[in-house]
């Protein structure tokens, strides 16, 4: 029978809505898990935010100028002979270079780490709030510092093999200390302010402690790192960028836990950057001076020769006045030739610093080519003048060009000397680094808030992972869709039954049957619908034996068996309920009966049926308990005596209901189910999984047993308040009638 007789057809919501509400169901069902994870992660984040050592940031601002302003009025165009404009990216790389950063590493001994030995997590936080020296250690042990302890190490050299290894320095009092390391032959003792040199098998140790403010027993952490490694780490930590596109303003910043040291590092870097720029400009000016100083005698000799040739011509031919055309040509020729010679001088000077492929040299080459073309054109024009005027113009031009070059060269040399002596570069320090007062990290509120968000995300992930790996079935339709079995009844979770179950564990004798205590409870109403479905299912079953089982323990199989038997009995049927779970069965407690005698005694032949059956535990319902738990229940159930008993029960009762152990736990159920006409499987909301249900069906099929239907037990509509309502038309289980009270008969029986 494939029709579900326990529920009317449902109006299905769109599939997209069902997916959404299922997700909401998972979140609602795991809300406490999500809240717990979020609270823990948020607490960890807040702990970190308030206990972590604060991080400070120091920054500097430098300006890169095209030419130094202080020299423009003095130098004029001479700067173009040696000043090559650099872009911001090049200056950024210079600022980050080993040449600049290395000076800060050396001057501040950044490769030496010396700090108090703090207790993990909270030690530094406690010390930051102390006002005086502390008593070292934790309960006198460990040498931990908790106060204003201070150490200043001016020099610390170790063999290369010990670089990066931690040393422990312990204050001994009276200005003395002890240095320890696992690689040292013996601990080394020294005096504050005095250089220490100790020869060990690994090499020589040199140490100079300038300051040691601590009580005897206080420990400090000391470490000497590689200079190159320290330099590279500092380069990586530097943040350098141009402030605005092509602004020429470069900002550099550094983060560190010691505000004073961080500011000192940035000031050292900025100072060295400016100093190297000035030094580079002075060196360039010096090279230009050397070049021009070698060129000056040649120009002087060239000028003297030109003047001598001009004078010889005048003495030979006398004074000759140029025409207006000749005068104009002479002036233009002098200007052009002078420019050409200056360009050639500039090219020669640039070649002392750069190769011929440098962009500056190539630009000069292009200008020389243009100017040479002009000179060639003027030379051709000169031939159109009379011969005597040609000679006069040529000689006068040579004199004026050589004179202009000579005078210009003298001026350039004087200006270059001013550049060299003036110590002026094309970069200047706009803002030095000030000691930061407020930390930039951690931002307490931000970290705490982000930790809370991360906690919620992790909680949601954990909820879905838990639901995927361990989550049970939450909707009866999933069972039908994935197994093909009909869900005969959906039994809601009963608050009254929860109370009864807690009373059941006290082993106090009484009747704890929900069908008797609250006969109109919604759970019992659903079992009545199961009774109807079972009646139709048994029409072609072959016999009146019904086996109830489940995939795993804890699905509520015994609750369903006991109350279903009572419900069927109240319908006028003679019913026998047999507790065949001879490993953990406890149905006798529902009726306030003893475990023995029971089924074990019948199988062993020690008792008769009349001696074992508890008559009329509920009107129309007889009951057989398990008896004492045997050590071989499977073998007993295989006994032919069991077959005889089942045949006898079938003949004496309208319906025989057998409660069996979980299928996935033991094999007992398959033995009994093979003789039954109807087998029902009890599953539990949020506990039974599809994998367990499929495996149960598979194992029973191996024993030639067919599961007729499923009972979906302990549905809690309040847990999945979205999906269940959407799938089933937003109805809830309610009692139809007046407020339920335990029946007087049930109260009397329990008493």
Swiss-Prot record:
Key words of the record: ATP-binding, Cell inner membrane, Cell membrane, Exopolysaccharide synthesis, Kinase, Membrane, Nucleotide-binding, Plasmid, Transferase, Transmembrane, Transmembrane helix, Tyrosine-protein kinase, Virulence
Ranges that cross the membrane: 32-52, 445-465
InterPro entries in alphabetical order: AAA_dom, Bact_polysacc_biosynth/exp, EPS_ExoP-like, GNVR, LPS_length_determ_N_term, P-loop_NTPase, Wzc-like_C
GO molecular function: ATP binding; protein tyrosine kinase activity
E.C. designation(s): 2.7.10.-
Cytoplasmic side: 1-31, 466-751
Bilayer topology annotation: Multi-pass membrane protein
UniProt-listed Pfam families: AAA_31 (PF13614), GNVR (PF13807), WZC_N (PF23607), Wzz (PF02706)
Cellular component GO terms held in the UniProt record: plasma membrane
Topological domain spans for side Periplasmic: 53-444
Localisation per UniProt entry: Cell inner membrane
Gene Ontology terms describing biological process: polysaccharide biosynthetic process
Signal peptide (residue range): none
First-tier enzyme category under EC: transferase
Catalytic activity as recorded in UniProt: L-tyrosyl-[protein] + ATP = O-phospho-L-tyrosyl-[protein] + ADP + H(+)
Function recorded in the entry: Probably involved in polymerization and/or export of exopolysaccharide EPS I which functions as a virulence factor. May be involved in an ATP-dependent process in the pathway for EPS I production, possibly export of the trimeric repeat units across the inner membrane or their polymerization.
Record-stated family: Belongs to the etk/wzc family.
NCBIfam families recorded: eps_fam, eps_transp_fam
Protein name: Putative tyrosine-protein kinase EpsB
UniProt organism field: Ralstonia nicotianae (strain ATCC BAA-1114 / GMI1000)
Lineage: Bacteria, Pseudomonadati, Pseudomonadota, Betaproteobacteria, Burkholderiales
